[in-house]
Structure formats: structure tokens, C-alpha cells
Amino acid sequence: MTLPLLNNIQAPFYEVFFSFQGEALYTGLPQIFVRFAGCNLKCNYCDTSYSIVVSKKAKHLTVLEVIKKIEVIYKKNKKSFAFTKPSIAFTGGEPLLYVDFLKEIIPRLKTRGFAIYLETNGTLYKNLTQIIKFCDIVSMDFKFPSECKKSFWKEHKKFLEIATSKKTNSVFIKCAMTKNTTLQEIKQTIKIIKSTAKDTPLILQPSLDKNKPKLQNLYLFYMFSKKYLYNVTLMIQMHKIYKIR
């Protein structure tokens, strides 16, 4: 079924490419990545800092132009999806800044048989309400004040409530661990998860660069989290190890 376009909306992008998911619960999953340009935050540890701003290198594309790129990439890599449903990973930047674009493109990708993987900083909960019914996987961050200069606890709680309101999707939380991460931040994270959706998987993701946390702190954060939550994993970003996108 072909859906009519409601408008000729555009959004800024840095790249559309094929790779394997490099972090969290779906590590190793073949995906087509769609990277938006622009973010509403500026975290110190961001591993795609170039995508925070919309520079001259960003390309402004329409819904149909992005779909065409996805279809070409899928055709070239079809064998990689032989044993799994093909999925589109919307990443950034922050995809939810462009919710009007997402509302147009996601239903069209779903009718083409693609699953939708949303990677987000977990702050724009009002925008999430407009597309959550289409999302198969939601990878949301908890952003800590120690690295992002501001707390987003209220936003994260509301975001998690909306993300888990659709019972048929997969939702998990990623927390970047740096040398500045505090036990109080871990405690607040646990408090929100326990009071909102206690079975949501929590991924503690240590930084691998100069900001990496001390091993004893990682152990402390992990053991403390496991004391109160059932589903906690300590996991590094594998794509950085293998130097793939």
C-alpha cells in the first residue's frame, strides 16, 4: 500500500548507511542507519559530536529521498538480513527534533516491511507521543548532570512512561559511565526505573576514552544497580573496538 505524502517536508542528515549495531541489547544486529543532524543537548562524551550542530555538510532531504537511499542500501545488503527482519535505526543527533519528518517516513517504512529502531537522548517526551505506536525498539539514554551540565530526571521519567506504554515494543535504557559519574546519579536512575517500569533493561556503558571511569567505580555502580534492579548489564560499545560506524 502506498501512503500519500501530506507535505514535502525535509530534515537535515549526515549519513544513511549499512552497518551492525554496536551497542546495548541489539549488538551485532544488521541495520540501516539514518543519522539526523542537530541535537538539543551537548554532552561532553558524545561519540558523534559532529552531529550536534547542523553544519554545511548536512544534506537536507525529503521523505522520498531518504526512502530511496534506504531501498538502495537494503538491496545491496539484502543477504545480511536473511535471518532477521530488516530494521532502520534512526539516530543522530537527536531524531525526535524532527518528529514531523518521522511521522511521515516511519509509516511508509513499516509498510515496506522494516522494523523501526529509535535511538534517542530520552528528553523530548512530547514528541515521542506522536510516533511511539510505530516504534519497535526504543533505545533511550539517561543523561547525567555530571556530563550534560543539567539534570533531566523529570523528562526521563515521562519519556520512559510513554516509551513503555506500548506493550509490544522493546525498550531499554543506556547510561554513559565516565570518570565524573556519581553514585547519586545511579541512585536516581534506579529510583525512576523502579517507580516507572521496573523490568526495563538498564545498560551501564563505560566510556573508553580519557574520560573512562575507574574500574572500582564501575563495579560499585553495577553491584548497587543489581541490588535493586533485575535486568542490569555492563557493556562497552563494540563498534569502537572494531572501528566500524
Predicted regions mapped to residue ranges:
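Conserved AdoMet/S-adenosylmethionine-binding subsite of the radical SAM
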Residues: 97-233, 237-245
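Short, conserved beta-strand segments within well-ordered enzyme catalytic domains
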Residues: 33-35, 87-89, 117
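Flexible, charged surface loops at secondary-structure boundaries
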Residues: 27-28, 74-75, 81-83, 110, ...
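Canonical Radical SAM [4Fe-4S] cluster-binding loop centered on the CxxxCxxC motif
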Residues: 6-65
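Conserved alpha-helical substructure of the radical SAM core
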Residues: 47-89
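Short, Lys/Arg-enriched, disordered terminal segments
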Residues: 1-10, 82, 111
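Short, solvent-exposed beta-strand edge segments and adjacent coil->beta transition regions
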Residues: 29-31, 85, 172
